[in-house]
Amino acid sequence: MGVARRLDDSRLRRLAYTRAASRLLGRTDATVGSACELLATAVDGVDGDRTVAVHARDVRSSAGVDTERAERLLGRVLVEAGYPVDLDDPDRELRALFTGDRCLLGWLVAESVRDFGTRAPTDRPFFQPGSMVSLDARAYANLAGAAPGQTILDPMCGTGGLLIEAGVAGSQVIGVDAQWKMVRGSRENLAAYLDDGFRVARGDGTRLPVPTDAVDGVVFDAPYGRQSKIANHTLDDLVEGTLREAARVAPRCVLIADRDWSETAATAGWQVDASFERRVHGSLVRHVHVLEERTG
């Protein structure tokens, strides 16, 4: 759960790990009584002809709150303020999030589209073991800047999972891979989900067939050294060389790997804007590096 200063409805619908966003009314202690007191002072009856509903959630059962009771009592506050209730098709929905010792109240603004299951790796025309799930691929594509009007490049595109999600988010996408098998498979997968706006070529990530400053963002999942062929490079040389090429063609890059490559990224000319880990299963933790062009 996080708080943002500004909300963009169209971007919210493309998010991966965020399910919904609300316009914050306020925050208080994680009790139903405190939530009702906050709501009573926050609502003013404006747009009182618009129907409402309440949805409460106890995040990971961390607050010990009876959410049905919370919905009932918060709904009573809204009725007393003059709002008609419609549980089936409300004009507005109040969200109450209880987490730990806090409660946040807000009017729902937008929900992200949860259709990732329709693009599961095993359901694509071309599949290889170890392919990234669509939910994670969308998150990393978003970090790279995937959006309408943007061009995203994956220099190690494999089966095309990252490019599919960047394309579904509205981007033009370019893929490069050293193996013809992957190039053909990626093209087949992209054609299954995107009408147009994609190109895939065989090439070397350390010598990209792309002009300087030609794309808006780069995103790639580096070989893990276990199931991936690395062609004629050592893994270290491949990752560093690809990062150098990424810095030539784009101002932003997202690198996903099974280890920390922050020092290599800095050597290749990038500034590490953020890094975090995401556990996939017991033997794999992904290291995600968000890289920005170095200034000054």
List the model feature ranges, each with a label:
Residues 84-88:
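Interaction modules related to DNA damage response and DNA replication/repair
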Residues 1-79:
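Non-catalytic nucleic-acid substrate-recognition regions in nucleic-acid-modifying enzymes
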Residues 1, 5-11, 21, 60, ...:
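Class I S-adenosyl-L-methionine-dependent methyltransferase catalytic core
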